[in-house]
Amino acid sequence: GYYNYKMSIGDLRVGTSFRQYRPNSKGTIFNDEFEKITNNQFGFYSGIESKIYNEILTINSTIRIDKNENYDYSISPAASIVISPNESDYIRLSFSSGVRNPTLSEQYLYYNAGRAILVGNLNGHGEDYGENLVTINSLINYFKPVVPNKDSLVFFSIDPIRPEKVRTLEIGYRGTVEDILYLDLSYYYSLYKDFIGYRVGAKFNANDTIVNGVVGYDLNARSIEIHRMSANSENNVSTHGASIGMNLYLNNYLINGNYSLNILNKKNTDDPIIPAYNTPKHKFNIGFSARELKFKNIKGISFNINYKWVDKFNFVGSPQFTGIVDRYSTVDAQLSKSFEKINTTIKFGASNIFDNKHYQVYGGPLIGRLTYVSLAYDL
């Protein structure tokens, strides 16, 4: 919960939260077959908002402190400035920081998905933690020659998963032009440290051998298991993007649209992490709607039509659910009629009206047309 306090310098808000997780999968999803998992986390929040210069300038500053029992305290400050020279225009500049503690899955997961075993990473993996862990390509190269060569194997280690940290700068404008055009523009840049994603490798049992004075390597092929492990990026990862929103009001008609650009930057690094960004680079919507139209003796007619386009993107899930989600577009439409005397509205509509079957996540179900009829009565 939280509380608000009125002060001479502004409005102060303080709050706190506590959450306890107690999963019980009996070893089917989490590593809790022999030992129960309990995970506690809590946080404290405080912020103050001040308005000065006849409320032309609004300054907001906050700080948040979080603690997960498996990690140290984390502090997340943030601040923003909003300039409103008049009642219809707002310019905003903000800096924010945040910490994302690893989820239960990223800490405790142990699930055999067939092609790979999906595991969390509370204690680390690999050579530094007493395990044989190699890259998939090097394991393939190991078995290519008639006499396998241990030197072909590339061993590596993954440190225990750490909280993901992000710092974001944003600038934006929101306002109206001639009372008919509403605009919302923004640009952001985010820098991630310890970005959480996944790494894939092979684990196996093996022993060094000496036969007739010759040193060898006995790799038990039957013990090979492919693991997908939660991991942090070795390099900083940045994202940036922009969004544009517009509403054009023409009497009872409205034309609206929005566009967003989101870019993940992993170039010029040799970081092996697989980032679970799962966000299309380009996405936009265009809509046309009307309210309470009148046609001769018929009134209370409303409608809306919306076109959505989403660019293709790489979706990262479990190994069998990782791949490209193709670009897709849909058209939604709705027609409604209100009956004032009986306080009732009837609506007919369809999402994806042209039945353009598409995936929104890799490995997910195909999504097609959905039609509906609704009757609403106002009490």
What function would you assign to each model-found segment?
Residues 5-11, 52-57, 87-88, 178-180, ...:
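Short loop/turn motifs that connect adjacent beta-strands in outer-membrane beta-barrel proteins
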Residues 7-9, 18-24, 52, 63-69, ...:
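Transmembrane beta-strands of outer-membrane beta-barrel pores
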